[in-house]
Structure formats: structure tokens, C-alpha cells
């Protein structure tokens, strides 16, 4: 099931693209991704007759259109901070066996967990 879902998502592609907002939207049909790239390079999007590239977008204030109106973004963080920081917990894996006794216990635990997970996936 997981493989078939991956296969479906990896080979699915949209061939209709909607451009514009809800009032003045229009559909563009493209037979392939290369046609979309060619169209985008011929039709550069502008704001107030000024082309805004990626460097200018990160370096200066940029107006972004939203449904509530124009929103001014002053500076975007390069990396978003995590929403939740979890404390470090001890590893659930057993400590390495240095005494020499019962040398295969770690592998047996791994095998039991693997078989249990496989049975759970088959049950789904």
C-alpha cells in the first residue's frame, strides 16, 4: 500500500495551472513541466512594473498580497525556529555489551521489534 501510494504521488503531475486571484483568475493548460518552465521564463512576474528577484526579496521590504490586503514583510528569518524543543532523553537501545556475556541479546531485541512491526503493517 505504501509503495503504491509513493508511486502514485511520484508520477502525478498537474497539467492545469490557475494564475491570478479569485476575481481575475485564468487557467493555463500545459502539456509538460518543460512547457511551464518556458512559459514562466517568457512571462516574468512584476510588481509595480519592477522585476523583483530573489536577492532583492530577501534584502529589502517586500509587499505580499494576501486575502486581507497587502501585508508588509520587514525581514524573513533564514531558518525557522522549532515550535517545540524536546529535552534529550536516554536512548531506548540497550547499552553495548562489553562483558562478553549474552552476546546476541541486542540483535534478538532488534529482531523482535522488526517482526512485530512487520506483523502490524501486514495487519493494516
Swiss-Prot record:
Disulfide bonds: none annotated. Keywords: Nodulation, Signal. Coiled coil: none annotated. GO terms for biological process: nodulation. Residues 1-12 form the signal peptide. Involved in the infection process during the plant-rhizobium interaction. This is Early nodulin-5.
